[in-house]
């Protein structure tokens, strides 16, 4: 998911 840095960090981990 593309989004501002830090927003989706947990989702993309």
From Swiss-Prot:
The keyword NADP does not apply. One of its GO terms (molecular function) is metal ion binding. Its EC number is 1.11.1.14. GO terms for biological process: hydrogen peroxide catabolic process; lignin catabolic process. The keyword Iron applies. Keywords: Heme, Hydrogen peroxide, Iron, Lignin degradation, Metal-binding, Oxidoreductase, Peroxidase. Pathway: Secondary metabolite metabolism; lignin degradation. It catalyses: 1-(3,4-dimethoxyphenyl)-2-(2-methoxyphenoxy)propane-1,3-diol + H2O2 = 3,4-dimethoxybenzaldehyde + guaiacol + glycolaldehyde + H2O; 2 (3,4-dimethoxyphenyl)methanol + H2O2 = 2 (3,4-dimethoxyphenyl)methanol radical + 2 H2O. It comes from the Eukaryota. Depolymerization of lignin. Catalyzes the C(alpha)-C(beta) cleavage of the propyl side chains of lignin. Belongs to the peroxidase family. Ligninase subfamily. This is Ligninase B. The lineage of its organism: Eukaryota, Fungi, Dikarya, Basidiomycota, Agaricomycotina.
């Amino acid at each position: 998911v593309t989004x501002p840095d830090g927003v989706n960090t947990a989702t993309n981990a």
